[in-house]
């Protein structure tokens, strides 16, 4: 954790696919069965200390370097991807955007929306994403993470003005 306020609850049960959730759940159960006070979900072997950032980033970079001749991918890229997937998922209809930009099925899309949102429309969508990223409000989230806002805005405009030619 960067700061004490960085600790938050993330509803992984609805965000992960069934097989992903099962692996995650098994890891959590395994950690609890060790009967040790674990302050960190992922920690150094036989220690109760947080992982050094290079424990994950170095192997990730090596794998990406093997897969791609040139790239700009970093482990932090997953954070951007998650923020953008959630922004589209919470603010757009399933077809065509969610169907074409993510690997979520329509059933998973509905389940995530039902679990995360109390209302079907509103600013709470952006505050939800900001909270999951550890931001107090959506300002930093939009400034640094939401790269698909124009796409989402275009989708919303088309919804409110169906007479606009989409070609």
Predicted regions and their residues:
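Extended charged low-complexity segments that act as oligomerization/scaffolding linkers
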Residues: 1-3, 20, 40-45, 63, ...
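DNA breakage-rejoining catalytic core of tyrosine-based enzymes
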Residues: 2-14
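Extended hydrophobic-aromatic, low-complexity segments
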Residues: 3, 72-76, 95-98, 141-142, ...
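Active-site/catalytic core of tyrosine-dependent DNA strand-transfer enzymes
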Residues: 11-72, 77-92
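A generic secondary-structure boundary signal that marks alpha-helix termini
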Residues: 21, 69, 91-95, 138, ...
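Structured alpha-helical bundle/scaffold domains in large eukaryotic membrane-trafficking regulators
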Residues: 24-27, 98, 145
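Catalytic-site neighborhood detector that most strongly recognizes the C-terminal catalytic loop/helix
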Residues: 47-49, 109-126, 132-166
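Active-site-proximal segment of tyrosine recombinases
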Residues: 73, 83-86, 90-134
